[in-house]
Amino acid sequence: MRTLLSLFALTLFIPASGAAQIRASEIGTMSQMIDGTKITMEYSRPRVRGRDPLFGTPIVRWDEVWTPGANWATTFETNKDMTLGGQRVPKGKYSMWIVVRQSGNWTTILDPVVRRYHMEPPDSSAQQIRIPVRPTEGPFFEVLTWSVPDITATGGTLAMNWGKTVVSMPIAVDPSFQMTMSAAEAAPYVGRYEYVRRLQPDSGQKSTLFVTHENNTLKGRWEPNDPYFRTFALIRIAPHWFAPGVYDRTGAIYEVYKPEMTFEFTVTGGRASSLEVRTEDDKVEATGKRLP
């Protein structure tokens, strides 16, 4: 009887085949879209577990070619050509590695062979993309984490946090629209327009829209001034069609209202005479008529 009870108790502690298990380094994914460019990373997420320091020890030795994760190599994938840390990255999927050093820059490596185990780092090759990075100190992260902590209309920052170590690389994507415009291209639109709102609750409200050309950009502003848009970029999305781009306080465009808001100019004889502002469901939100 005692033997039967012992066998029954033992079976309680034997995991069933295929049952879920807690891993030392769980799989994590990170995905971010920036103006149509999708960046995806997949990686195992080691924990600190009281180990300090992490680098320059048997955990990650100096001059080691280390995958910033665990188990199978961390992967980086982009659906379009883009720039990472100043280096051009063709669209595709790569395994990611970092050469860690006691002083000076570290080196991020994107290798075209995706499926590699973390104990089998790649040899140096001409097909690799190498990006110098400077490790810094930041807030403590128990679990290794990849993220895009800040984003602009044309890029952002890719960052790894583990313990108090931060590795970050600037991201730049190819814009899907033309941000700049020459003076000759802008000339037909520059001027003042009587601007009349057509949708409730502002129906019939009038203001003046000023269209100018500054710093190789077509810009607009309303008088009285709109506290949110202030001075905004008019970004060409089709012939005579523009979407407003909103600036942050540093002068960088951080949001483009496409397709929520479209300025459609009517050009006759090389000069815009009027405009309509349409919503994404093609309703006329406002109209404008050129003033003398």
Which residues does each predicted region cover?
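Short N-terminal segments immediately surrounding and downstream of signal-peptide cleavage
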Residues: 21-40
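Positively charged n-region of N-terminal signal peptides that target proteins for export
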Residues: 1-4
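Peripheral terminal and inter-domain segments
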Residues: 131, 139-153, 160, 171-292
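Extended, well-structured beta-strand/loop surface patches
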Residues: 42-91, 97-188, 222, 288
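Bacterial N-terminal signal peptides
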Residues: 6-15
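A short, compositionally biased
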Residues: 23-28, 76-78, 102-104, 152-156, ...
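Bacterial Sec-dependent signal peptides at the C-terminal "C-region" and cleavage site
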Residues: 15-23, 292
